[in-house]
Amino acid sequence: MAYSTLFIIALTAVVTQASSTQKSNLTFTLADFVGDWQQTAGYNQDQVLEQGGLSSLFQALGVSVTPIQKVVLSGENGLKADIHVIIPYEGLSGFQMGLIEMIFKVVYPVDDHHFKIILHYGTLVIDGVTPNMIDYFGRPYPGIAVFDGKQITVTGTLWNGNKIYDERLINPDGSLLFRVTINGVTGWRLCENILA
């Protein structure tokens, strides 16, 4: 009888410990996302040109560019990913420079020989994100996710035949809540919180 009691106590302790561990994993902080966001926001030069829709422009201008990834805090609860594209002044005509300024509106001087444009690739906001939401990031197909305690539907669409999935989280009332764009080839994600 004593052995049975001890076994039950030990088993209860194990279950309780597992339960408390599981509960502790139900909340995430910004630090939990930093590594993944930096990795999935990483673009090489070809990806920046292609996915940023800039390939034809820079090919026509005949200039070499250097993309630099910047991942910064965006408030207390989000990460913002930008790509800073460094462009040399050398070799650009007045017409070409005017074209760049017309398209990108703002150019930023870097030094006497270079300027940059900034491509904004979205902000990841993590308020209310649950483990189900984490699972969703790797699923380029329809499913169910939980956001801020509410169950919502995820829909996946193929965009432009380029294996880019534009996935949306939709509230029960049909309003759009959160969007994640996943490139099925390279695996990068553009995460946008689109709450009004």
UniProtKB/Swiss-Prot annotation:
Name this protein carries in UniProt: Oplophorus-luciferin 2-monooxygenase catalytic subunit
Annotated localization: Secreted
UniProt GO cellular component terms: extracellular region
pH dependence: Optimum pH is 8-9.
Record keywords, A-Z: Luminescence, Oxidoreductase, Secreted, Signal
Organism listed in the record: Oplophorus gracilirostris
SUPFAM superfamilies: Lipocalins
Source superkingdom: Eukaryota
Chain's role: Catalytic subunit of oplophorus-luciferin 2-monooxygenase. Oxidoreductase that converts coelenterazine (the oplophorus luciferin) to coelenteramide under emission of blue light with a maximum at 454 nm. Is also active with bisdeoxycoelenterazine.
Secreted among keywords: yes
Enzyme class name: oxidoreductase
Regulation: Inhibited by micromolar Cu(2+).
GO terms of molecular function: Oplophorus-luciferin 2-monooxygenase activity
Temperature dependence per UniProt: Optimum temperature is 40 degrees Celsius.
Additional remarks: The shrimp has luminous glands at the base of its antennae and legs, and ejects a cloud of brightly luminescent secretion from the base of its antennae upon stimulation.
Enzyme Commission numbers on file: 1.13.12.13
Keyword Kinase on entry: no
Subunit architecture: Heterotetramer of a catalytic 19 kDa and a non-catalytic 35 kDa subunit.
Signal peptide: 1-27
UniProt record, GO biological process: bioluminescence
